[in-house]
């Protein structure tokens, strides 16, 4: 295998440098991009990630990198046999006789497609139109989590514009900063990283926010909530947590996770707890969903 070394200068932890095709790293990246906070591909859990990247016959792995993900077909999935690995240790689980457990993950005993295979293909088709920030997080770029990805997506509106921006331009985006900007610029210089983007584009993945015309697109910088720090708390009926955060950010606001003196107002749903109490203690304005919707549409 490849030698272990720091990924970049200043790193304390050691990583396998064969990042593209190191099966263990690829497995973890695939499981991560399928997770709820990223592309939310329900059928792409840890066991499916193992089957796709580390099948019993390594040469038969349908995923050699993330670039292959949206090109998967039923024909790719059906032959796969895989060992069942423990998510914590990464070691094979054993059956009653002490032998590694092996499963035909994507097919039934009669050879027909298992529901998980059909569901995975449906999920992947749906994932092609996920919000831009989720696509950005799915690329597993160091330091780029959901908060920074939302800000970048709201400001630039397309993956191409994000990667065409200079470090200085990236650093100016709220929540980004110099380290993250450098990480973005370094990531896009790698050939196989660019291949992921081009293959996903060719497969029909939406790499831009429809109607967004460029930096700020007028929406964020001049939006209804421009410069405001807004907190949502409690159970909301009209919005999921993701939807209300998206509405705040795309209109220039900051979707904050905690209440402080800088908070402009709090949107409170049912069973709002400590954040509501904190807002009342600080004299911060509290509104309900209906009022938030009214301000959004005004």
Task: State each model region's role.
Residues 1-41:
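Cys/His-rich short segments
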Residues 30, 69, 248:
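Conserved hydrophobic/aromatic packing and binding residues within compact polymer-binding modules
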Residues 31, 36, 47, 74-78, ...:
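Feature of Fe-S/electron-transfer and energy-metabolism proteins
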Residues 1-4, 52, 58, 69-70, ...:
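Generic low-polarity alpha-helical segments
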Residues 13-18, 47-54, 68-76, 92-94, ...:
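A glycine-rich phosphate-binding loop feature that marks nucleotide/adenosyl-phosphate handling sites
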Residues 9-13, 27-31, 46, 163, ...:
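Short acidic (Asp/Glu) and glycine-rich catalytic loops that position anionic groups and cofactors
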Residues 33, 52, 60-61, 80-298:
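DNA strand-break repair and replication-stress modules
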Residues 24-27, 39-47, 54, 58, ...:
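Conserved ATP-binding/catalytic motifs of P-loop helicase motor domains
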């Amino acid at each position: 295998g490849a030698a272990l070394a720091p990924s970049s200068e200043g790193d304390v932890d050691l990583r396998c440098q064969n990042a593209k095709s190191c099966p263990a790293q690829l497995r973890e990246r695939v499981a991560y991009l399928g997770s709820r906070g990223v592309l939310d591909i329900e059928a792409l859990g840890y066991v499916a990630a193992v089957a796709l990247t580390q099948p019993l016959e390594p040469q038969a792995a349908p995923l050699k990198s993330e670039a292959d993900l949206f090109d998967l077909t039923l024909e790719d999935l059906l032959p796969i046999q895989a060992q069942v690995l423990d998510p914590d240790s990464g070691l094979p689980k054993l059956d009653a006789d002490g032998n590694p457990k092996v499963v035909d993950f994507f097919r039934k005993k009669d050879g027909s497609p298992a529901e998980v295979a059909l569901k995975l293909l449906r999920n992947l088709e749906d994932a092609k139109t996920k919000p831009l920030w989720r696509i950005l997080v799915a690329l597993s770029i160091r330091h780029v989590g959901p908060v920074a990805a939302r800000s970048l997506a709201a400001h630039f509106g397309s993956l191409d514009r994000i990667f065409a921006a200079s470090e200085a331009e990236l650093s100016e985006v709220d929540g980004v900063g110099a380290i993250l900007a450098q990480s973005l610029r370094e990531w896009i210089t790698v050939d196989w990283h660019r291949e992921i983007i081009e293959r996903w584009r060719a497969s029909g993945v939406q790499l831009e926010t429809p109607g967004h015309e460029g930096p700020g697109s007028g929406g964020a910088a001049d939006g209804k909530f421009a410069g405001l720090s807004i907190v949502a708390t409690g159970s909301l009926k009209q919005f999921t947590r993701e939807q209300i955060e998206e509405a705040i950010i795309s209109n220039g606001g900051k979707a904050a996770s905690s209440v402080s003196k800088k908070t402009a107002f709090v949107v409170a749903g049912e069973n709002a707890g400590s954040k509501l109490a904190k807002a009342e203690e600080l004299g911060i304005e509290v509104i309900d969903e209906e009022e938030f919707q009214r301000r959004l549409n005004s």
